[in-house]
């Protein structure tokens, strides 16, 4: 055979090898060895047992029971009954090969009155100790959130909850008890979950507890001021965070090897018109309010200048002492990333209808000026997949906050269930598999190509659960929960995918490394001869046969075009996502 023929054959083999190596899907071994993979939950959405074990009502108990029409006529009295079933659910986490479980502590279960002077509920303490021990016994690390929107209703009745500065010292006491009781076994802590969502949805839009807003914004709101209350609540939330961190760093059980941070919920924003300076600046303002409003204070001790400019005198200020307490009060930042929007400059707002949502002169849109949608969505109306936004958010934090450590504390997508879909259809969640797959790809790029210091990823959520104002109609779980027939758990197809992705001993992984080493030894550009090249190719094929067989058995992905029906008509969904 002529030399030229050998040359083209070798080039063909090299091309085949390169394509095959590049086509190998990511799995847990694609990430750093100490990278944490987990799943997440919250007390109110999971536990149930609202009147058991000494627990008092929370603001969400009050909200869902007093205004049932605002939560799809659903409540979380039982939720998914995690309070009684946690041992079985932890077994499912272990089967999924999860490293960690993020959950929140119910303030009302630990200190029913909300005030330490009235005593600590020993039964509540024991429940969380038992939960922690069960996790550790299954080699799952607990990650505890102090506050996931469910403070005792008694504090709301007494002084308005987070509308009052009194909440700060009560939260400090609650946090201190948590550190003293659980700090010897829990090393990962977060203070406040999604302060942006809590304040905006609860006090500007009024569609989440405490359900306050201006009457013209939402006629269901009984009281509130959408113009001022979000800033007040957010301010007290930040001070409560700082107080908790101060206690954390004084506590002997947590001060040496524990870490603590705040959890934010940023969307990514692209300019509505890519050539418009106004829209580019609008996107920057949107990010400043979504991220900087809460991250700047816990890093630098003060609000961003752009937030001060647009919020004006409605934005409270920190004292010198408060600023000092806030500065560097987050060892890491937790990010709950779900979706993205286009941002358009809003030149005029109605002075007769002031509210937080319009203060920064930004209008959120699902489509840009040419009609291009931000990403595939479904008939849920509030989540549209935009995985590249995750990478951009991580780089935004890297560039503006000195590449501080990041944990993805929530990421997931829901399936809308109006009661007409059979279980057999819902468990075929190929769209969820593709959602996680594409977000892992962008996360991997952020870490490997961009150098972002991301240290963990928690999927939302293990189980379908009570999804706030959506009740049980928005299913985020990897496991289907039958809310009609005894809360039985059924694995969705995404469970099978996650088991493969998180497998701790993957057949063929070492072979991949061996192939890469062989390629380097051969120069990967030229081979000594066709015989060696062909032998190498045959070796590669043999070593990866098991992986190819497994790939052939994977679910086919019909996302995004066939499984998602885009909801074109909703530009500003009321939901927090």
Swiss-Prot record:
GO terms classed as biological process: carbohydrate metabolic process
Superkingdom in the source lineage: Eukaryota
GO terms of molecular function: beta-glucosidase activity
InterPro entries from the UniProt entry: Glyco_hydro_1 (IPR001360), Glyco_hydro_1_N_CS (IPR033132), Glycoside_hydrolase_SF (IPR017853)
Entry's EC annotation: 3.2.1.21
Catalytic activity, as annotated: Hydrolysis of terminal, non-reducing beta-D-glucosyl residues with release of beta-D-glucose
Residue positions the entry lists as glycosylated: 328, 368, 524, 544
Organism in which the protein naturally occurs: Arabidopsis thaliana
Protein name: Beta-glucosidase 30
Keywords: Disulfide bond, Glycoprotein, Glycosidase, Hydrolase, Signal
Signal sequence annotation: 1-23
Enzymatic class: hydrolase
Gene induction: By sucrose starvation, dark and senescence.
Annotated a beta-D-glucoside binding sites: 45, 148, 193-194, 338, 410, 460, 467-468, 476
Family: Belongs to the glycosyl hydrolase 1 family.
Disulphide bond pairs: 213-221
PROSITE patterns: GLYCOSYL_HYDROL_F1_2
Active site: 194, 410
């Amino acid at each position: 055979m002529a030399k030229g023929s050998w040359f083209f054959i070798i080039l063909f083999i090299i091309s085949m090898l390169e394509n095959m190596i590049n086509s190998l899907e990511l799995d847990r071994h694609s990430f750093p060895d100490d990278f944490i993979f987990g799943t997440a939950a919250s007390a109110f959405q999971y536990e149930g047992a609202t009147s058991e074990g000494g627990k008092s009502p929370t603001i969400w108990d009050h909200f869902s029971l007093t205004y049932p029409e605002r939560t799809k006529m659903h409540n979380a009295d039982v939720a998914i009954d995690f309070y009684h079933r946690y041992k079985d659910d932890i077994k499912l986490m272990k089967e999924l090969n999860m490293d960690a479980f993020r959950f929140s502590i119910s303030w009302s279960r630990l200190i029913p009155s909300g005030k330490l002077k009235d005593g600590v509920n020993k039964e509540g303490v024991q429940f969380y100790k038992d939960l922690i021990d069960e996790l550790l016994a299954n080699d799952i690390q607990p990650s505890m959130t102090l506050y996931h929107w469910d403070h005792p209703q008694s504090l709301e009745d007494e002084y308005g909850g987070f509308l009052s500065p009194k909440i700060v010292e009560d939260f400090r006491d609650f946090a201190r008890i948590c550190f003293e009781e659980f700090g010897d076994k829990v090393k990962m802590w977060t203070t406040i979950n999604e302060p942006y969502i809590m304040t905006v949805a609860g006090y500007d839009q009024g569609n989440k507890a405490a359900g306050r807003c201006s009457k013209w914004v939402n006629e269901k709101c009984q009281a509130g001021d959408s113009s001022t209350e979000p800033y007040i609540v957010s301010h007290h939330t930040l001070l409560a965070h700082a107080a908790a961190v101060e206690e954390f760093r004084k506590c002997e059980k947590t001060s040496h090897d524990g870490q603590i941070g705040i959890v934010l919920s940023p969307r990514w924003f692209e300019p509505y018109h890519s050539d418009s300076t106004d829209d580019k600046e609008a996107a920057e303002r949107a990010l400043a309010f979504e991220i900087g409003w809460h991250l700047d204070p816990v890093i630098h001790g003060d609000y961003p200048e752009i937030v001060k400019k647009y919020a004006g005198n409605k934005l409270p200020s920190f004292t010198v002492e408060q600023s000092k307490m806030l500065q560097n009060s987050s060892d890491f930042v937790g990010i709950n990333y779900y979706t993205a929007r286009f941002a358009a400059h809003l030149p005029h707002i109605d002075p007769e209808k002031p509210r937080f949502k319009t203060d920064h002169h930004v209008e959120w849109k699902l489509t840009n000026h040419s009609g291009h949608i931000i990403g595939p969505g479904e008939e849920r109306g509030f989540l549209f997949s935009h995985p590249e936004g995750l990478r951009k958010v991580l780089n935004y934090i890297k560039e503006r906050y000195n590449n501080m450590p990041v944990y993805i504390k929530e990421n997931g997508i829901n399936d809308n269930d109006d009661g007409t879909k059979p279980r057999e259809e819902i468990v075929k969640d190929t769209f969820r598999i593709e959602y996680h797959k594409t977000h892992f790809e962008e996360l991997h790029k952020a870490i490997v190509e961009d150098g972002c210091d991301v240290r963990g990823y928690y999927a939302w959520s293990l189980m379908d659960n009570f999804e706030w104002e959506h009740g049980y109609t928005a299913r985020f779980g990897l496991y289907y929960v039958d809310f009609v027939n005894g809360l039985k758990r059924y694995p969705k197809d995404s469970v099978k995918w996650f088991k493969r992705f998180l497998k701790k001993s993957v057949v063929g992984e070492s072979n991949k490394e061996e192939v890469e080493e062989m390629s380097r030894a051969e120069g990967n550009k030229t081979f000594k001869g066709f015989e060696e090249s062909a032998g190498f190719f045959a070796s590669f094929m043999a070593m990866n046969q098991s992986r190819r067989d497994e790939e052939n058995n994977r679910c086919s992905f019909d996302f995004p075009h066939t499984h998602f029906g885009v909801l074109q008509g909703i530009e500003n969904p009321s939901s927090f996502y």
